[in-house]
Amino acid sequence: MRYKLAHYVGSITVFSLFLVVTLTAFGQKMTTLETEQRLSDLGYWITKVDGKRDDSTRQAIIAFQKIEGRKRTGVLSASDIERLRTATRPVAKFASGPAHVEVDISRQVLLYVGDDGIVQKIVSVSTGNEQKYFDDNQWQVAHTTRGNFKVQWKYNGIRKASLGDLYYPSYFNGGIAVHGSPSIPPYAASHGCVRVPLFADKALFKMMPVGMPVNVYDRQ
């Protein structure tokens, strides 16, 4: 039995047939498989290039939209598709030195940079939202401090905390860590930690040994 579904998002018609999605807008077309392959080629974190849209597909699109300064929807518009076809791999702010992690607060992305200075992985994150919150019997501000740090210690598993569960956290500034979370909106929303999607938390945990540099900055 075959099923063909169609719905409209703005000026984009999305056809879904056997988990293969074609995005069509003003003559621009790109299947889910093509989208995943192109994003993966540019370094955006795709768990598996298989033509099946999942959370990594959506988050990779959002990361691409963040990097390119576009509307963060998780769905490719016609102009997004056009840009994706010609885009280049993002460039690290700190291209020299050993392998490291960069957290770009302005664009809400994490870049994993290899020993050669080339960005190997880009994943969407959510950092401190600068709002006040009450914890440990005091008011605090949800701020992710900018600066150059190193991974200090790690917790191999899910760490229970008063503000929520931290999945495979790598602490780099006191109680601030890069950790997995089921909630990664396309904007800053954390209490100060760097949230990453659950599909990337275990891999990042292994990729970030104690002592690895973590550079947190606002992009100029």
What name fits each language-model region?
Residues 32, 36, 58, 62, ...:
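Extracytoplasmic/secreted envelope proteins and their assembly/folding machinery
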Residues 45-51, 69-72, 96-99, 137, ...:
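Second-shell loop/turn segments in exported
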Residues 88-131:
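A structural motif detector for short, solvent-exposed N-terminal "entry" segments of globular domains
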